[in-house]
């Protein structure tokens, strides 16, 4: 059945879904292609709007994760370069969200190389400073390892213990890392889907960061969030797509 009711299609002059799919791929005229495109775009925007309404309502659940008045001065002083104006602004906005009684759901969008991981490290340090753990999940082991290396560079000078959990670790290495995470010894962990497996438990997860650069699964992001008590969520993306925008 067509996901858009006939009454709505009639009101907005939209063609049916099957017809739109057929004509967007095999249009007999430019007008036919534009009509099909309008129909599919309408549905995409409708789905996005409904998802936003649902998530805004769900977001009223309160969180116990309150990151209030963190001191980032030591972190900023440890950096070999000054933060840009945009980085300062974004960090301030994220920290304001994390101080709220409601769980944050925020998209951090920026081109590759724009410093998104530095921003993630800064807000992770704020959460860790208040006794929480932070986790960054990436869709590939290579990307997870890159993030772990960058996070280690920024956070280890601050005394933060950073770990990596991926599927390629030996069973013994995985067990040791998971035990350290559960005990709270690892304060910041980067990893892949191994982070959401049932065997992985956190001591006090307060911030979930995911890298959507390669369209990481929304379901897996939600599974990681369920490892904590309504933790704050930050999604990093170079090119936001409708799914990542619907936070």
What residues fall within each predicted segment?
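Upstream accessory/linker segments immediately N-terminal to the RecA-like ATPase cores of bacterial MutS
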Residues: 1-79
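Conserved pre-motif I regulatory segment
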Residues: 62-109
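Conserved SF1/SF2 helicase motif Ia
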Residues: 105, 119-149, 156-161
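Short hydrophobic/aromatic beta-strand immediately N-terminal to the Walker A/P-loop
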Residues: 105-111, 135, 234
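Conserved glycine(s) of the Walker
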Residues: 115
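Conserved motor-coupling elements within RecA-like helicase/translocase cores
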Residues: 168-189, 196-205
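Walker B catalytic acidic pair
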Residues: 192-193, 211-212
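Post-DEXD/H (motif II) to motif III coupling segment of the RecA-like Helicase ATP-binding lobe
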Residues: 202-207, 213-247
């Amino acid at each position: 059945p067509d996901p858009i009711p006939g009454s709505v299609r009639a009101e907005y002059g939209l063609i049916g879904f099957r017809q739109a799919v057929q004509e967007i791929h095999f249009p007999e005229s430019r007008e036919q292609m534009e009509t099909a495109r309008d129909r599919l775009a309408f549905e995409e925007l409708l789905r996005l709007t409904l998802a936003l309404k649902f998530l805004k309502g769900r977001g009223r659940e309160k969180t116990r994760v309150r990151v209030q008045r963190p001191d980032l001065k030591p972190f900023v002083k440890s950096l070999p370069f000054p933060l840009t104006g945009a980085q300062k602004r974004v960090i301030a906005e994220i920290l304001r969200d994390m101080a709220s009684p409601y769980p944050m759901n925020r998209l951090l969008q920026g081109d590759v190389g724009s410093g998104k991981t530095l921003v993630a490290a800064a807000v992770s340090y704020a959460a860790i400073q208040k006794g929480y753990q932070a986790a960054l999940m990436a869709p590939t082991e290579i990307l997870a390892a890159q993030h772990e290396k960058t996070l280690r560079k920024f956070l280890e000078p601050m005394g933060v213990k950073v770990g990596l959990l991926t599927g390629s670790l030996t069973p013994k290495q995985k067990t040791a890392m998971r035990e350290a995470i559960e005990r709270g010894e690892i304060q910041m962990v980067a990893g892949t889907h191994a982070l959401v497996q049932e065997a992985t438990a956190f001591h006090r997860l307060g911030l979930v960061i995911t890298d959507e650069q390669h369209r990481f699964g929304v379901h897996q992001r939600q599974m990681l969030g369920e490892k904590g008590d309504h933790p704050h969520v930050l999604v990093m993306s170079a090119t936001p797509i409708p799914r990542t925008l619907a936070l």
